A protein has these predicted regions:
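Low-complexity segments
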Residues: 10-140
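Bacterial signal peptide processing site
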Residues: 5-8
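Sec-dependent bacterial lipoprotein signal peptides
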Residues: 1-3
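Short, solvent-exposed mixed-charge patches
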Residues: 143-145
């Protein structure tokens, strides 16, 4: 069982994050909810690494992307999703991204296995609770480019 971060599972090499800047990140009106707790499937391959589940911004609300086992691209690093406030209080969001050895963004590898969220509830921006089912279909599935 896992939530975002703090995992003892094999993880990809982490990219050093640059400071978030307007124009390079997405402006969002409010922070994401707390991470969902997920049941992590058995590691499907000895070379696989675990990418924790994460929130992504849909333009209107936060959507959960389930954690997943992937084979990392050769010499690639992974920059975790993050939020930051500008000096004037604007909240910025940058999704998790993969980068090649030159730092260029590359497509996320297809998942070998995906985590399953436990049943629970998230609170929407205006305070309304929304139920989450344990086997809810992921809001976003990584796509090959």
């Amino acid at each position: 069982v896992s939530g975002c971060g703090g995992s003892s599972l094999p993880e990809p090499e982490q990219a050093t994050p640059a400071p978030l800047k307007q124009g390079e990140a997405i402006e969002v009106p409010f922070p994401p909810p707390p991470a969902r707790v997920e049941f992590i499937p058995e590691k499907p391959n000895s070379g696989a690494v675990w990418i924790d589940g994460e929130w992504s911004w849909t333009g209107r609300r936060w959507a959960w992307t389930y954690g997943r086992w992937v084979i990392p691209p050769s010499s690639a690093t992974f920059a975790r999703w993050r939020t930051a406030r500008t000096s004037d209080g604007i909240l910025l969001f940058a999704p998790g991204t993969w980068h090649d050895e030159r730092g260029a963004q590359i497509a996320e590898p297809l998942p070998l296995a995906v985590g399953v969220a436990r049943e629970g509830e998230v609170i929407l921006p205006h305070g309304q609770p929304e139920k989450t089912a344990p086997n809810q279909v992921p809001a976003k599935t990584p796509q090959a480019h």
